[in-house]
Structures are given as structure tokens and as C-alpha cells.
Amino acid sequence: MFILGSFTEEDVREYDLFNANNTREDWELAGETSEYNCMAYAFGAFEWMVPYSYWSGDEKIEEMAKEINLKKKKHIEALRKALYYGDYDHPFAMKLAITRMLKRFKGLRKIKSLKELQKGEYGIAYACGGGDFHFGTYIDGSWSHKMGSLDAEEVECEDDVFGDCYDSRRVYFAMKFSEVGKINFD
């Protein structure tokens, strides 16, 4: 599993995260695998990805609070509780996830609506709810997504991506096709 706050260049090379070395078979690339989830699908990767992993003990709450400029003890405690209980749609948890995505993925920018997409970009929508997060992609007027270990699928509309479960506010991003697979390690 790749945690946005902690994976390294060596991890990307070793696991061939973006299939740069063509280590995966065609059937794996078609989305018929449990090897990657919705986040990986949205960003063109082929290993499970999560925005953070507080519950695993891999990350420290103080460091995560710094990433989103939380200084008050009550705010840091609110973040800790949200992450511990898997409250992905808590405002601080969403801010942490969004901050990490924008920092890690080259060519990614936050937008207010898909109307802001420019030539050479595709849309990504992010929402949370029910103790989970989900991503959908918007390319040339079509929506698609990948639920956990299930196959990727094209759906009729954005609401079909998220259903009733992912009921947080939706956050939209524009991703440059030419930058897929390029990661910031600063």
C-alpha cells in the first residue's frame, strides 16, 4: 500500500507504481484486478493508494497536523480522532488528503468545476463518507471509477460514481495527461 505522505522514489521504482517498466500484464492494466483501488485508478497507478494511514502507526499526528498548519491542541485532537475513527469526511481529514494530493502529483490542480478543464487534462472527483473515500475520473465527457478491488467501470453520470454512501462535499481536480506518473518527492 502506498501512503501519500511516506512513499519514496525507491518504492515507486521497486513496485513499478505507474507501470513505467511494463511489468504488468494486459489483464492487470484493464482494471480486472484487486491489486489497486479507486485512488490509484484516478491517478494512473497500479498499487493500492491511501491519502494517510494514521491507524497503522506509520505516521505521526503531529507531523500530519503541521502539513495542514494546525496549531491549536483542540484542532490537532480533532484531526487525531477523525483519522483514528476513519472519519474521512471530517474537514481536517479532507484538507490533509487534498494537501497531500496537490503536493505529490505533478500536473494536478484543484478546480471548482469540470468546466475549468483545459486541453490535455482530465477531471478527478474526490468525496468521502461512510468511513471511506472514493475517486472518479472524467475523461471526454464520460465518468468512470473503480470500487476497491472490483473492476473499473464506466458509469452514466457523476452521481453514479459516488452513490449515496460518499456524501461529503465533492472536490474536483484537473490532471494533465502528460504528467500522469510523475511524483514530487520534496
Residue ranges and their predicted role:
Residues E59-D151:
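...with weaker cross-activation on analogous glycine-rich loops/strands in unrelated enzymes
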Residues E14, D26, A40, P51-S53, ...:
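Intrinsically disordered, low-complexity N-terminal regions enriched in serine/proline/glycine
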Residues I139-D186:
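Active-site or metal-binding loop neighborhoods of secreted/extracellular toxin and effector enzymes
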Residues V12, F46-W48, K60, G131, ...:
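Short linear sequence elements within intrinsically disordered, low-complexity coil regions
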Residues M1-E32, Y36:
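N-terminal intrinsically disordered, low-complexity, charge/repeat-rich segments that act as generic
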Residues E10-R13, N22, Y36-C38, F43, ...:
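Alpha-helical structural elements
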